[in-house]
């Protein structure tokens, strides 16, 4: 038996969230049930448990198997719609995908009246180590986190906010985004009070972009054409665009 980590993407609207037991069609349930139905009776460990409607380009799960990683990836890619395994790495037996170097999320903003200059006024204040209890749901866990990157980027007219950290709290990114969008052009200290911020930005715009591990090199799955990742990435972006258009015109 060899331990492997797999990078995979999915479109959030087709699932009831990530975590097993979260509704009748979670990402984790779908993967495990598909593997079991094909004789792969393995438990998986996942790096990030994204909320409902949140998509991923590169989440990570690991499992121990006597089969080849290409066989595992091929099974998932051929039998599950809207989930795509695109790379893998052999990892130590004690590997835990949650113990990453850092995760990167992108939150896409479809508003033509905004630019990165106006968004950067408060965005950079989240960088560093802070107590984020104001930006999470009620939780007894330690709410101190270290943000290593919080930046705004413009990709051919499509704005997105990018956040990187070793770990994030539940709804932390979406609540920070709501704060930023509510204070455009107004310099405000996000940590001036501990009172919980009342608004959370829409989940449909959030994308888990990638997860990084020191010393682990992932290989592309060979049996899938290289162009498929680009096609899949485009499908996620089209999904984000469509969801925002429907929301804007009151369809969803």
From Swiss-Prot:
A single GO molecular function term of this UniProt record: RNA binding
Binding site for substrate: 105
BP term (GO), one: tRNA pseudouridine synthesis
Source organism superkingdom: Archaea
A Pfam entry, by short name: PseudoU_synth_1
Active site, per annotation: 51
Keywords: Isomerase, tRNA processing
Catalytic activity reported: uridine(38/39/40) in tRNA = pseudouridine(38/39/40) in tRNA
Main enzyme class: isomerase
Enzyme Commission numbers on file: 5.4.99.12
Family annotation (Gene3D superfamilies): Pseudouridine synthase I, catalytic domain, C-terminal subdomain, Pseudouridine synthase I, catalytic domain, N-terminal subdomain
Similarity comment: Belongs to the tRNA pseudouridine synthase TruA family.
Protein's job: Formation of pseudouridine at positions 38, 39 and 40 in the anticodon stem and loop of transfer RNAs.
UniProt xrefs under HAMAP family: TruA
Protein name: tRNA pseudouridine synthase A
Source organism per UniProt: Thermoplasma acidophilum (strain ATCC 25905 / DSM 1728 / JCM 9062 / NBRC 15155 / AMRC-C165)
């Amino acid at each position: 038996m060899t331990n492997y980590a797999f990078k995979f993407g999915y479109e959030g609207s087709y699932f009831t969230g990530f975590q097993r037991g979260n509704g009748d069609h979670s990402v984790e349930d779908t993967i495990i049930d598909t593997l079991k139905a094909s004789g792969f009776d393995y438990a998986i460990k996942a790096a990030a448990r994204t909320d409902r409607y949140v998509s991923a380009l590169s989440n990570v799960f690991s499992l121990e198997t006597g089969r080849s990683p290409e066989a595992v990836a091929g099974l998932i890619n051929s039998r599950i719609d809207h989930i795509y395994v695109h790379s893998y790495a052999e990892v130590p037996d004690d590997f835990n995908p949650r113990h990453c170097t850092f995760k990167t999320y992108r939150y896409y903003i479809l508003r033509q009246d905004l630019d990165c200059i106006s968004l950067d006024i408060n965005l950079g204040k989240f960088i560093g180590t802070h107590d984020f209890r104001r930006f999470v749901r009620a939780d007894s866990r330690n709410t101190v986190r270290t943000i290593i990157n919080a930046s705004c980027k413009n990709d051919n007219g499509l704005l997105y906010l990018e956040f990187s950290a070793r770990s994030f709290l539940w709804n932390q990114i979406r609540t920070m985004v709501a704060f930023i969008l509510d204070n455009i052009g107004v310099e405000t200290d996000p940590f001036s009070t501990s009172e919980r911020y009342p608004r959370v930005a829409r989940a449909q715009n959030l994308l888990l972009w990638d997860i990084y591990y020191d010393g682990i090199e992932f290989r592309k799955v060979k049996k899938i054409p290289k162009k498929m990742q680009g096609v899949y990435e485009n499908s996620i972006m089209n999904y984000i665009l469509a969801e925002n258009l429907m929301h804007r015109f009151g369809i969803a």
